[in-house]
Amino acid sequence: MSFEYAPAPESRAVVDIAPSYGLFIDGEFADAAGGKVFKTVSPANEEVLSEVAQASAEDVDRAVKAARKAFEKWSALPGAERAKYLFRIARLIQERSRELAVLESLDNGKPIRESRDSDLPLVAAHFFYYAGWADKLGHAGYGADPKPLGVAGQVIPWNFPLLMLAWKIAPALACGNTVVLKPAETTPLSALFFADICRQAGLPKGVVNILTGDGSTGAELVAHPDVNKVAFTGSTEVGKAIARTVAGTDKKLTLELGGKAANIVFDDAPVDQAVEGIVNGIFFNQGHVCCAGSRLLVQESVQDELLEALKRRMSTLRVGDPLDKNTDIGAINSAEQLARIKALADAGESEGAERWAPACELPDAGYWFAPTLFTGVTQAHRIAQEEIFGPVLSVLTFRTPEEAVAKANNTPYGLSAGVWTEKGSRILWMANQLRAGIVWSNTFNKFDPASPFGGYKESGFGREGGRHGLEAYLDV
């Protein structure tokens, strides 16, 4: 049985996007020193949403100086006073959540259901969570009176713009640091709206500074001599470059990089439940997730049954307008990312894997890619080794738990994994054997601000979230 869904669009009118935005430095919006701007577009239709200032080295220096000046008073505030600001920010995010969700879907391309029901609740939850820690740092296990580091330079990606901002800013402020944050070039708007929330909350000037720009802006921020802490989420290639820049300095560094997660399904797993977990694991946020379950490892005895059910489920996925509440898969974030996804999918075919995608009518304008499944994949295929960062699933098989572990660990990355089985002892054994920072049991892509997140190998180092996330912003 198939169902037809009438469009159920969220109103774009709930968010007011200005024609242009400056940099947020020392509590005020200002033009870039060089006067340069760039356009941010909607990936769903390539419409220009706004013009945004391009920060130069001079702007980076101004922002870092503002953060350094604010640090003296901010770090001296009692934790309970800092907590009041964080609680206020969290409540303002909740009050403006509909506006922010629409903005995120417009600028990023993700479905409104995801930005509304997943991203925004987690954003607020992170500020609430770390507000609770601000006056309890002496009980976090890092000494009786842990001290902040100073100025934190933070660079975030385009896949979860506002959520990654919360992951970084909330613990930094709770610990008494000040922040200079650079959002991704293709998704700057939610960070600029957050700057306005900081003003609404009465946050002291200079405590949070937002610099928009391209990779050169991020490089200037990372290299600035008065930055004490660098936190980066993004590609492994850029992460390695940042590590080289920071090497030999006294900067503290956290890197959360790429992944090639294995979603492992054993023969005793409930098929329908596993299929939902597989779909959520790879097609959530168009596969633009560092911990996406982009490799499906299925036990040979249930391969046919599982793939048949998975294809049926994929055929029901709706691709289209991110603001339509019925949409399951939105737009790819940029033309560059779409080109990379296409190139790796083509490589999968040319290397001998069998490609399948459901019948899917894609919009003419914008950047789109149908949910895609590859079978007959081997460990040597590029689609089994390289991060695609799109809605592409590579299927491999295994016979024994030992073989599943060997295949799952045979990747440069070590960020996440999922295990589907009814045997608790098997789950515990697998979790101990898998070289992954996060292992989900009979679920996937579940996040909580109280739970640490991070990986091994080329997936980076350090942890964000939970009590462990405080350590990155304390002098311990």
Tell where the protein language model's regions lie, with residue ranges.
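Terminal low-complexity tails and localization/encapsulation signals of metabolic enzymes
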Residues: M1-E51, K84, R88, A125, ...
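Short, well-ordered beta-strand elements within core beta-sheets of diverse protein domains
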Residues: V48-A55, A70-A76, Q154, N263-F266, ...
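Structural signal for hydrophobic packing residues in well-ordered secondary-structure cores
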Residues: F71, S75, A90-S97, A101, ...
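ALDH superfamily catalytic-core signature
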Residues: E237-T378, S441
